[in-house]
Amino acid sequence: LEVHYQFLENDDFSFGLTGGFRNYGYHYVDEPGKDTANMQRWKIAPDWDVKLTDDLRFNGWLSMYKFANDLNTTGYADTRVETETGLQYTFNETVALRVNYYLERGFNMDDSRNNGEFSTQEIRAYLPLTLGNHSVTPYTRIGLDRWSNWDWQDDIEREGHDFNRVGLFYGYDFQNGLSVSLEYAFEWQDHDEGDSDKFHYAGVGVNYSF
């Protein structure tokens, strides 16, 4: 469940706020036997868009999460912060360039806990192309720093990773509130421990604005 409220929106400055709640239910089998877990996540997330010049804008969002209940079972840290923010330069009505800094960090406010902590830092670059009702956006994610300790029960040492991605997003706006999208991405991952991984992502979306 998420609720968004737009406090202010005009060409010079926009500011909104999203609040949310999610429940996670787990049913699994481990060595001692069958078990269940039930975890909750609370979210608050401001977003903004600021006009710096006619062609240059500063925008982004910041999500703050709080996790509760059965964290030792699920392995999650109790707190998480995620943000993506940066600059967009518009060359003309067709072409723009957006370069963002992305951070996701899981940590524990309770000093007695260390499970589920991680950090991800990336540079994300987008090249939005607008052609009438069509929009095409090639993009890339370049890993700056990434580590995790998801296996804290067996090995408290942090494991380093290197994730990079290239992708393509396509959208079509029917100009009646309805829009559809297609997306494909390829990601390669290198790890301090274990083999490298490669992933293909594909997505289809339908959106309706009232």
Residue ranges and their predicted role:
Residues 1, 36-44, 75-83, 105, ...:
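Residues that define the transmembrane beta-barrel architecture of outer-membrane proteins
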Residues 1-14, 19-24, 201:
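Short glycine/proline- and aromatic-enriched beta-strand/turn motifs that initiate or cap beta-hairpins
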Residues 5-7, 46-50, 54, 85-95, ...:
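Residue-level signature of outer-membrane beta-barrel architecture
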Residues 8, 20-37, 51, 63-76, ...:
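Sequence/structural signature of outer-membrane beta-barrel proteins
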Residues 10-17, 54-60, 93-99, 129-138, ...:
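Repeated loop/turn-to-beta-strand initiation elements of outer-membrane beta-barrel proteins
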Residues 79-88, 92-110:
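Hydrophobic, aromatic-enriched interface-forming segments
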Residues 105, 112-180, 194:
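Intrinsically disordered, low-complexity segments enriched in Gly and acidic/Ser/Thr residues
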Residues 184, 197-210:
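Outer-membrane beta-barrel "beta-signal"
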